[in-house]
Protein backbone atom coordinates (compact mmCIF):
# COMPACT_ATOMS: atom_id res chain seq x y z
CA UNK A 1 0.00 0.00 0.00
CA UNK A 2 1.40 3.36 -1.05
CA UNK A 3 0.94 5.93 1.73
CA UNK A 4 2.34 8.72 -0.37
CA UNK A 5 0.48 11.89 0.76
CA UNK A 6 0.49 13.31 -2.75
CA UNK A 7 -1.35 10.22 -4.00
CA UNK A 8 -3.70 9.93 -1.03
CA UNK A 9 -5.07 13.37 -1.90
CA UNK A 10 -6.36 11.94 -5.20
CA UNK A 11 -5.26 15.11 -7.01
CA UNK A 12 -2.04 13.88 -8.59
CA UNK A 13 -0.59 11.24 -10.86
CA UNK A 14 2.86 9.91 -10.02
CA UNK A 15 5.00 9.46 -13.13
CA UNK A 16 8.04 7.28 -12.39
CA UNK A 17 11.21 6.81 -14.38
CA UNK A 18 13.35 4.21 -12.61
CA UNK A 19 16.94 3.20 -13.23
CA UNK A 20 17.52 5.62 -16.09
CA UNK A 21 21.20 5.40 -17.02
CA UNK A 22 23.37 8.02 -18.63
CA UNK A 23 27.05 8.98 -18.68
CA UNK A 24 28.01 12.08 -16.75
CA UNK A 25 31.11 14.00 -15.81
CA UNK A 26 30.43 13.97 -12.11
CA UNK A 27 32.45 13.64 -8.93
CA UNK A 28 34.50 15.68 -6.49
CA UNK A 29 37.61 13.49 -6.60
CA UNK A 30 40.40 14.15 -9.08
CA UNK A 31 40.11 10.70 -10.70
CA UNK A 32 36.40 11.38 -11.33
CA UNK A 33 37.28 14.42 -13.42
CA UNK A 34 39.09 12.38 -16.07
CA UNK A 35 36.25 10.48 -17.74
CA UNK A 36 32.47 10.38 -17.70
CA UNK A 37 30.99 7.66 -15.49
CA UNK A 38 27.72 5.80 -15.35
CA UNK A 39 24.99 7.56 -13.46
CA UNK A 40 21.68 5.93 -12.59
CA UNK A 41 18.64 8.01 -11.65
CA UNK A 42 15.21 7.35 -10.23
CA UNK A 43 12.73 10.16 -10.74
CA UNK A 44 9.09 10.56 -9.70
CA UNK A 45 7.14 13.53 -10.96
CA UNK A 46 3.75 14.42 -9.50
CA UNK A 47 1.39 16.02 -12.00
CA UNK A 48 -2.08 17.31 -11.36
CA UNK A 49 -4.89 15.08 -12.60
CA UNK A 50 -7.20 16.65 -15.12
CA UNK A 51 -10.96 16.65 -14.74
CA UNK A 52 -11.48 14.25 -17.66
CA UNK A 53 -9.73 11.00 -18.60
CA UNK A 54 -7.11 11.35 -21.32
CA UNK A 55 -5.67 8.91 -23.82
CA UNK A 56 -3.46 11.13 -25.94
CA UNK A 57 0.28 11.59 -25.42
CA UNK A 58 -0.08 15.29 -26.16
CA UNK A 59 -2.42 15.65 -23.16
CA UNK A 60 -0.13 14.16 -20.50
CA UNK A 61 3.27 14.76 -18.96
CA UNK A 62 5.60 12.71 -21.17
CA UNK A 63 8.49 10.69 -19.71
CA UNK A 64 10.68 12.21 -22.40
CA UNK A 65 10.57 15.50 -20.51
CA UNK A 66 12.20 13.84 -17.50
CA UNK A 67 14.98 12.43 -19.66
CA UNK A 68 15.41 15.78 -21.39
CA UNK A 69 15.78 17.59 -18.04
CA UNK A 70 18.43 15.10 -16.90
CA UNK A 71 20.39 15.26 -20.14
CA UNK A 72 20.37 19.06 -20.31
CA UNK A 73 21.92 19.23 -16.84
CA UNK A 74 24.46 16.49 -17.65
CA UNK A 75 25.50 18.30 -20.85
CA UNK A 76 26.18 21.56 -18.97
CA UNK A 77 29.58 20.26 -17.89
CA UNK A 78 31.33 18.69 -14.94
CA UNK A 79 29.39 18.62 -11.66
CA UNK A 80 31.15 17.85 -8.39
CA UNK A 81 28.21 16.54 -6.38
CA UNK A 82 25.25 14.31 -7.12
CA UNK A 83 23.15 16.62 -4.96
CA UNK A 84 23.89 19.50 -7.35
CA UNK A 85 22.82 17.44 -10.36
CA UNK A 86 19.65 16.37 -8.56
CA UNK A 87 18.78 19.92 -7.54
CA UNK A 88 19.30 21.30 -11.05
CA UNK A 89 17.25 18.51 -12.60
CA UNK A 90 14.43 18.98 -10.07
CA UNK A 91 14.43 22.74 -10.73
CA UNK A 92 14.01 22.13 -14.46
CA UNK A 93 11.12 19.75 -13.88
CA UNK A 94 9.44 22.04 -11.35
CA UNK A 95 9.54 24.83 -13.93
CA UNK A 96 6.88 22.88 -15.86
CA UNK A 97 3.51 24.33 -14.81
CA UNK A 98 1.82 20.94 -14.47
CA UNK A 99 4.49 19.56 -12.11
CA UNK A 100 3.57 19.87 -8.42
CA UNK A 101 6.48 17.96 -6.86
CA UNK A 102 9.55 15.89 -7.72
CA UNK A 103 11.34 13.04 -5.95
CA UNK A 104 14.76 12.25 -7.35
CA UNK A 105 17.70 10.08 -6.42
CA UNK A 106 20.93 8.98 -8.06
CA UNK A 107 23.74 6.50 -7.77
CA UNK A 108 27.13 6.09 -9.36
CA UNK A 109 27.28 2.29 -9.76
CA UNK A 110 30.96 2.22 -10.71
CA UNK A 111 32.26 4.73 -8.17
CA UNK A 112 33.70 2.11 -5.84
CA UNK A 113 34.13 -0.87 -8.13
Where are the language model's segments positioned?
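N-terminal, polar/charged subdomain of small-to-medium soluble alpha/beta proteins
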Residues: 1-113
